Amino acid sequence: MKLILLLCFISITNYSFAQKIFHQQKAKGKWQYIYPFVDKSYILAIQHLIIERKPFAEIYNANIYFGKSEPKANKIFWKENIDMRQITHNITYEDYNNDGIKDLLIFEDTGARGGNSFYNLYLVNPKNHTLTKVKDFDKIVNPSYNKKHKVIVSYGLTGTNYYQLYRFGKKYKPYEIGKPFDDTDNLDLDKKIAAILKITKTTEQKNKQLTHQ
């Protein structure tokens, strides 16, 4: 009896995990496939419109899968569920951790005035074939990476357009550097970034000295 129960458990377990997720002919929703590595067996799949869209709705629920396609079953390394706005060109690539590898950004939504865009960032590691999501990156408006100063530059469109600088902390969680500053006609952005980083470095050095006293 125990042997029968054990065999049933193994059968159910294999059925739960050994499934074909990618390239299903009758899968629910609209599927989008991204191949972040040279090895095309690794796939990032977005399952759009898993719930029927309500009239006039702009944001919808989607599943994102990252895994490896194999003949009999797919290995799913991780899965997440997010709300996002569906647009045609929703994938972009830009290096955000200064390792020379372009990372993957998935468009999530727009904010006020329609010009404020938000993204989910996944750091690409071609050696280990991993995609690592950066927590809270989708809170940074209109992000770009400044290679010279190694900072993330956010540009927000509000009543007064402004900049905010970020860097990655532990576990690649972004944190603010300095305070936001307005975009003016006389602004030299390069000099402004350099000045903020200089002040930040001086403050950090003083704090370390106080800690060791």
Task: Label each region the model flagged.
Residues 4-5, 16-56, 146-213:
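Acidic, small-residue rich beta-repeat scaffolds with periodic aromatic anchors
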Residues 11-13:
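N-terminal signal peptide c-region/cleavage motif recognized by signal peptidases
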Residues 25-31, 79-90, 137-148:
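Repeat-based blade/solenoid architectures
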Residues 65-69, 115-133, 165-170:
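Beta-propeller blade repeat segments, especially FG-GAP/WD-type strand-to-loop junctions
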Residues 75-78, 132-138, 175-183:
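Beta-propeller fold detector
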Residues 92-96:
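Calcium-binding motifs, dominated by EF-hand helix-loop-helix domains
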Residues 99:
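Acidic carboxylate motifs that coordinate Ca2+ or other divalent cations, activating on Asp/Glu
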Residues 104-108:
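Hydrophobic beta-strand segments that make up the repeating blades of beta-propeller
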